[in-house]
Amino acid sequence: MKMKYQAFNKELLSMVCVAAFTFSANSFAAVDVDAAKSLARENSCFKCHGTDKDKDGPAYTKVAAKYRGKADAEAKLIHHITSGEKAKFPDGHEEDHKNIQGKASPEEIKNLVDWILSL
């Protein structure tokens, strides 16, 4: 009887692990890449940022690398693109960063930031 109980527990544990992995993977797959790129185009983000190539601003892959593993990464990037704070350019001058607050919903902004961080 004890052997059947142990086998059942192992099988149940395996199913729970598979379910947990499946649901956690789905949360990472929630980024709508097309919507993120569309929002970036609509707000002229690609004028200064390339996906993987520097322009006047850093490439999004570099932004992702800079913030990778940091707990406050999403909040910092959302603040940066919604506050109009200063952006530093390669030649040393500073300008107000384009502010997309009011031009997109909070969910669209979060999706854009999540896409950038996924690169």
Model-derived features with residue positions:
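Axial heme c-ligation environment in periplasmic c-type cytochrome domains
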Residues: 56-67, 80-110
